[in-house]
Amino acid sequence: MASTPRTPAPVRSPPPVPTPTHPTPPPPPLETPQPPLPVSTPPPALETPPPRRVRTPPPPLETPPPPSPSSSQPGDEYHTPAPSLADGSPREEEASFPSDGREGGGAPAPPKSPQLSPMRLAAPRLLLPPPSPRTPTGQNGQEEQEGGAKAAAAGAGTGTGTAAPARQQLRLTGLARSPSSQRSLATTNSSPSPSPSPTPPSPLTPAAAPVVNNNSNNKNNRSGQSTPKRAAETKLPLSSPAATATIAVQHFNPVEEAVTSPLHLGIGKAQRLDHHQHQHQQRQEQHAAAAAVENGGSVPPDVAAAVAVGERRELSVTLRLATAVLSLAAFSVIASARTSGWAGDYYAHHLQYRYAVAVNVIVCAYSIAQSFGEIRRLISPRFIFRSMSSYYCSLFLDQALAYLLMSASSAAASRNDLWVSRFGTDAFNRKITSALWLSFIAFLMLALNALISTANLFSML
């Protein structure tokens, strides 16, 4: 089949694109990095030499002005007078406000302070003594007048002129000298060191006036250190005995002394201390204390127990010595029992006899040891007190050995009775019988010792 040729399509222009009415903003430009600013380096500074110091001469010293004719003397007092209105210059109203520099004129000069000049006042030691209240008469008056004239001349010589009025001097007008103090003063002048009184003064008695030693005053006056003021103070008028008695009566109150007396316990008679009754009570207490000591009432329990044990110690020593002797005799007789021949016998052939000998030996040794201990406590007082363990040990051994001795003696007696019933009596049996009697008596002594040990133990508990 034949193919038909294809014709190409005509070329057409593309349709027009509509344009927008509003303009489009241009794209933002790209930010370019700013180049770094060049850093300027300062030029190196030139070293300048330090300035030289120029030494200036010190200012001349100001010479003090020459002293004025009315210069002060050493020891004078200076007082600054208060400024007066007449000496100072009147203050202006605008001088009190500081200047702010707006006005043409400069700041006004500050007002000058008044001229200060030292004032010399009379020293207290140069003041004349105040006039004495009493009229100077006799020798004392003449001395006071001479002292006043000397003080006035001294004041005129120093140039004080008219002295200021003196202060009122304090005087002691309540001092008085009693006749007793005058007598003690005379004794003091006659003897340099009087002996002190053996009895202390009563607290209700007013104290004596202080004694003035005239000798010391005379020495002070002679040394030149006394002044008219001191002389006027030391020369006090002596009071009469009546005035001294009046002062003493004012301080003494019999009612107050009776109330505050240590011997007075109350106002009523029932509350007053009776000396004889107090002595009688003391005697009764002493008799009661002595009776209590005799009866053991005031003795400590341990001491009373030790005394009770000591009272039984002699009996215990006697019984223990007897037990030791009887036990020694018993085992000695049993050990010596021996017969020879075809019918001979010996204690070692029988167990019961050996048992009796061993127990008697132990009891004898124990009794001898206990006897020595009790004798030592009787002789030496420092071994009186014993420990509680020793009391327990003594009681236990006494009872145990008494039981063993009774057991051994009974066993030996049974064996001896059986031998006699079979073979009759001979020398061996008779020795065994006598030894057993000694062993039984030793048992009785040891039993009594056990009772004493029990009493001692319960006394110490």
Curated annotation (Swiss-Prot):
Query: Which residue stretches are annotated as topological domain Cytoplasmic?
Result: 1-314, 376-392, 453-461
Give membrane topology per the record.
Multi-pass membrane protein
Keywords on this record?
Cell membrane, Membrane, Transmembrane, Transmembrane helix
Positions of region (Disordered): 1-239
Localization: Cell membrane
Task: Give the InterPro entries listed for this entry.
Answer: CASP_dom (IPR006702)
Composition-biased stretches (Low complexity): 116-126, 135-155, 205-221
Looking at the UniProt entry, the stretches that span the membrane are 315-335, 355-375, 393-413, 432-452
Question: Is-annotated flag, keyword Chaperone?
Answer: no
Its primary localisation, in coarse terms, equals membrane
Cite a single Pfam family from the UniProt record. CASP_dom
Mind telling me which GO cellular component terms the entry cites? plasma membrane
Locations of Pro residues compositional bias?
A: 7-69, 193-204
Signal peptide extent: none
**Family classification:** Belongs to the Casparian strip membrane proteins (CASP) family.
Q: How does it assemble?
A: Homodimer and heterodimers.
Could you identify this protein by its name? CASP-like protein 4U1
**Source organism of this protein record:** Sorghum bicolor
